[in-house]
C-alpha cells in the first residue's frame, strides 16, 4: 500500500436523524409543555444533542497542542542498506505512506502559530513492519538532557500557577539555573525560533538512535529533514503582527499550499557514527543538548518526504494522531540518551490518557501496512476493531496458524551495561558553552546575531535583575561578545557578565 487509505464514513442521507438513526421532525424547537412552558425531559433529540456536545472536547496535548498535519509519502533515493535493515529503506524508489504533524510546543490549542517556540516535526511511516514514528522538532538540540527535568522545564513555558499569566521570570530563572539549556536558547532566540510557517523549516530527530544492518552491525545515527522550500523565518515584528492578524498562519499556509498542489517536500539525510567513535568522542554522543558537527560526520542523503493530501477531517486525523518515539521497526533502535528513554514512556502514557487505551485503533494511528498479531492487546474502552474475534489471547499455545515471534526483530544486543544503580550526573569532559559559542560566532551572520540580541533583550529585560545577571554570565561563557552585547541591550553594565572575583 503506497498511501494511507482515506477513512470511510457514512455520507449524510436526506433526513436529519438522532445518533441512533431515528428521523428528526424539528431541529429548531425543543419539545415543551405549551408554547411558553418548560422543556420536556423525554425529548430525546434535545438530550442527545446536548449530552454529546458536553463531551466533544478531549484533553489537549500537554505540549504540542496547536498544530496542523497532512498525508504524503517517503521515497528512497539513496541506498543505505549497509547501515540499516529496515524494509522501508530496502531499495531505491520504494515509497512508504506517511502522516506528518507540525506544531508549536508550549502554546494551548488556540494559541498563535507565530509565537517564539520550537516547532514539533512528527512523522508516522506506515511500513510493512509496523509504524515507525519519527518524533522530532525543528531544532537539532533540546533544552535539557535528562527527562527528569522535562516537567519542570515545560512548567516554566506555561502559565504562572497564581496569576495564570506567562511569566518571563519563570522562563529565565530556569534557563539561568540550568546552563545546559543555553545551546537551544541561543537557537530559539534567533529568527529560527519564529519560522515562516511549517513548510520553510527543517526537521530533526534530535536524539541519537541506532541503525542495525542485516549483519547485525550497529551504528549511531541522527536524522535530518532539510526543507526543499528553503529556510524562511519571520522577524519578531512580523511574528507579532501575525499573532493578531492571522494566529492560524502556519496551519493555513500548509493546508492552502497542498490544496493548490504546491506539495511541500523535505530531503531526508542521516549522520552515521561507528559505535567505537562514541567511546572517545569529544562530546557525549547521547547528550541531546549537543550536535555532531557535519565536518566530523557529514550528511548522507536517504530519500524525499512529500506531503500531497490534506486531512478530510481535522479532529479525525490531526487531533487524534498519536506519535511515540518508542514506535520503531526492526533495524532502528534507541540509544542510551536519557531524554529519549523518558520520552519512550511518556508519549505512549499520555496517548492512553488523552485518547484512551485503544488509541492505536484510531484510523490515523493504525499500522495499515503491517500484517501483525497483537494477540494480547484486547478489550478496554472503545474497542472497535473486532477485538480479534475468537482468536486466543495467550501465548505460547498449540494452535496452528497462531502468530509467531520474529527473531529478525530482536534488538542487536550490542550495548553492554554495568555500574552502580544511583542518580548519576551526566559527567563528561566537555562544555555546555563551546557549541553555542561556535554557533554564535561561525553559523550566524552579523545581521542574525543582531536579531538574536534584540530578541533576547526584548524578553530578558522583563525578568528580575538577579536572573538577568545569572543569564548574561552564561552567554559570556559561550562568547564574551555575546554576553556583553546582551548585557548592554538590557541595560546592565558589561561587568555583570564577568565571573565574580575570589
UniProtKB/Swiss-Prot annotation:
- Keyword entries, A-Z: Heme, Hydrogen peroxide, Iron, Metal-binding, Oxidoreductase, Peroxidase, Peroxisome
Q: What's the superkingdom here?
A: Eukaryota
**Which annotated residues bind heme?**
347
Q: Which Gene3D superfamilies match?
A: Catalase core domain
Enzyme superclass (EC): oxidoreductase
Q: A Pfam family name for this chain? A: Catalase-rel
Active site: residue positions: 64, 137
Q: Which reaction does it catalyse?
A: 2 H2O2 = O2 + 2 H2O
Record motif Microbody targeting signal, residues? 500-502
**Which CDD domains does the annotation name?**
catalase_clade_3 (cd08156)
Major place of localization? Answer: other
Q: Which GO terms describe its biological process?
A: hydrogen peroxide catabolic process; response to hydrogen peroxide
> What family does the entry list?
Belongs to the catalase family.
Q: What does this protein do?
A: Catalyzes the degradation of hydrogen peroxide (H(2)O(2)) generated by peroxisomal oxidases to water and oxygen, thereby protecting cells from the toxic effects of hydrogen peroxide.
Q: What is this protein called?
A: Peroxisomal catalase
Amino acid at each position: 500500500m503506497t498511501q494511507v487509505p482515506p477513512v470511510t464514513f457514512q455520507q449524510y442521507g436526506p433526513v436529519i436523524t438522532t445518533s441512533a438513526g431515528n428521523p428528526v421532525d424539528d431541529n429548531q424547537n425543543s419539545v415543551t409543555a405549551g408554547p411558553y412552558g418548560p422543556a420536556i425531559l423525554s425529548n430525546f433529540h434535545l438530550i442527545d444533542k446536548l449530552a454529546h456536545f458536553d463531551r466533544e472536547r478531549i484533553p489537549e496535548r500537554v505540549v504540542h497542542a496547536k498544530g496542523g498535519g497532512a498525508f504524503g509519502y517517503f521515497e528512497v533515493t539513496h541506498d543505505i542498506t549497509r547501515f540499516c535493515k529496515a524494509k522501508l529503506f530496502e531499495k531505491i524508489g520504494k515509497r512508504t505512506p506517511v502522516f506528518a504533524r507540525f506544531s508549536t510546543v508550549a502554546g494551548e490549542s488556540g494559541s498563535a502559530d507565530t509565537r517564539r517556540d520550537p516547532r514539533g516535526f512528527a512523522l508516522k511511516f506506515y511500513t510493512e513492519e509496523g509504524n515507525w514514528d519519527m518524533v522530532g522538532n525543528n531544532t537539532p538540540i533540546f533544552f535539557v538532557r535528562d527527562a527528569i527535568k522535562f516537567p519542570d522545564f515545560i512548567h516554566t513555558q506555561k502559565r504562572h500557577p497564581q496569576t495564570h499569566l506567562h511569566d518571563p521570570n519563570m522562563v529565565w530563572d530556569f534557563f539561568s539555573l540550568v546552563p545546559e539549556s543555553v545551546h537551544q536558547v541561543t537557537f530559539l532566540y534567533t529568527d529560527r525560533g519564529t519560522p515562516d510557517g511549517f513548510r520553510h523549516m527543517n526537521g530533526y530527530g534530535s536524539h541519537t538512535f541506532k541503525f542495525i544492518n542485516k549483519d547485525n552491525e550497529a551504528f549511531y545515527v541522527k536524522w535530518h529533514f532539510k526543507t526543499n522550500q528553503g529556510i524562511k523565518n519571520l522577524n519578531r515584528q512580523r511574528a507579532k503582527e501575525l499573532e493578531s492578524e492571522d494566529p492560524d498562519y502556519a496551519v493555513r499556509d500548509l493546508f492552502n499550499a497542498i490544496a493548490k498542489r504546491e506539495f511541500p517536500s523535505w530531503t531526508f539525510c542521516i549522520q552515521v557514527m561507528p559505535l567505537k567513535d562514541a567511546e572517545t568522542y569529544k562530546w557525549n554522543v547521547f547528550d541531546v543538548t549537543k550536535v555532531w558537527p557535519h565536518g566530523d560526520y557529514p550528511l548522507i542523503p536517504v530519500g524525499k518526504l512529500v506531503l500531497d493530501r490534506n486531512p478530510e477531517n481535522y479532529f479525525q486525523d490531526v487531533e487524534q494522531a498519536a506519535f511515540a518515539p518508542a514506535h520503531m521497526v526492526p533495524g532502528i533502535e534507541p540509544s542510551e540518551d536519557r531524554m529519549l528513554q523518558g520520552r519512550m514512556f511518556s508519549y505512549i502514557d499520555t496517548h492512553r490518557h488523552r485518547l484512551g487505551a485503544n488509541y492505536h485503533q484510531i484510523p490515523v494511528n493504525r499500522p495499515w501496512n503491517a500484517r501483525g498479531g497483537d494477540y494480547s492487546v484486547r478489550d478496554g474502552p472503545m474497542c472497535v476493531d473486532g477485538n480479534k474475534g475468537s482468536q486466543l489471547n495467550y501465548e505460547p499455545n498449540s494452535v496452528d496458524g497462531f502468530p509467531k515471534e520474529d527473531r529478525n526483530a530482536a534488538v542487536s544486543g550490542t550495548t553492554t551495561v554495568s555500574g552502580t544503580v544511583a542518580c548519576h550526573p551526566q559527567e563528561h569532559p566537555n562544555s555546555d558553552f563551546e557549541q553555542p559559542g561556535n554557533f554564535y560566532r561561525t553559523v550566524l551572520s552579523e545581521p542574525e546575531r543582531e536579531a538574536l540580541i534584540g530578541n533576547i533583550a526584548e524578553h530578558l529585560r522583563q525578568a528580575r535583575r538577579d536572573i538577568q545577571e545569572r543569564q548574561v554570565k552564561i552567554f559570556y561563557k559561550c562568547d564574551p561578545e555575546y554576553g556583553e552585547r546582551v548585557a548592554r541591550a538590557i541595560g546592565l553594565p558589561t561587568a555583570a557578565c564577568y565571573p565574580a572575583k575570589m
